[in-house]
């Protein structure tokens, strides 16, 4: 009568990886995630390698993890993978402050975000 302990959250031809607590704002992370959406994984890795954005290094690690999950856990062919989804969410926002003139206090927000990348195997048509 018990439920399946680990139900599959993606389709049979998909694999995914998540990164949480990334020290950047969701807006900045979404700029980099938008670069790789819908692309083949080889091109996405190349784009992330040569991107000048600081967070591109972490996005590349997450994409490599999704590729490794697809190959090792789900038996998918790496050469036929595309980035099906790359979505960004908000995480916590640390609130800090800085003393300002005349006894005031400036609020400093330090946002965190999370990233989920799903790769899908697509049969190449020729």
Curated annotation (Swiss-Prot):
A GO MF label: rRNA binding
Keywords annotated in UniProt: Ribonucleoprotein, Ribosomal protein, RNA-binding, rRNA-binding
Species for this entry: Jannaschia sp. (strain CCS1)
GO cellular component, one term: cytosolic large ribosomal subunit
Family indicated by similarity: Belongs to the universal ribosomal protein uL22 family.
Subunit structure: Part of the 50S ribosomal subunit.
GO BP terms, alphabetized: translation
Region forming the signal peptide: none
Function: This protein binds specifically to 23S rRNA; its binding is stimulated by other ribosomal proteins, e.g. L4, L17, and L20. It is important during the early stages of 50S assembly. It makes multiple contacts with different domains of the 23S rRNA in the assembled 50S subunit and ribosome.
Pfam families linked: Ribosomal_L22 (PF00237)
Protein name: Large ribosomal subunit protein uL22
Gene3D superfamilies in the cross-refs: Ribosomal protein L22/L17
């Amino acid at each position: 009568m018990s439920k399946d302990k680990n139900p599959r959250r993606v389709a049979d031809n998909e694999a995914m990886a998540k990164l949480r607590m990334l020290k950047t704002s969701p807006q900045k992370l979404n700029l980099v995630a938008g670069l790789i959406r819908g692309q083949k994984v080889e091109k996405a890795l190349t784009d992330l390698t040569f991107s000048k954005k600081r967070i591109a290094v972490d996005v590349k690690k997450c994409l490599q993890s999704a590729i490794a999950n697809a190959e090792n856990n789900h038996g998918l062919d790496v050469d036929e993978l595309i980035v099906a989804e790359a979505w960004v969410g908000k995480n916590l926002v640390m609130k800090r402050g800085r003393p300002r003139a005349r006894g005031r206090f400036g609020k400093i927000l330090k946002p965190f975000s999370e990233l989920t990348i799903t790769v899908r195997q697509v049969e190449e048509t020729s």
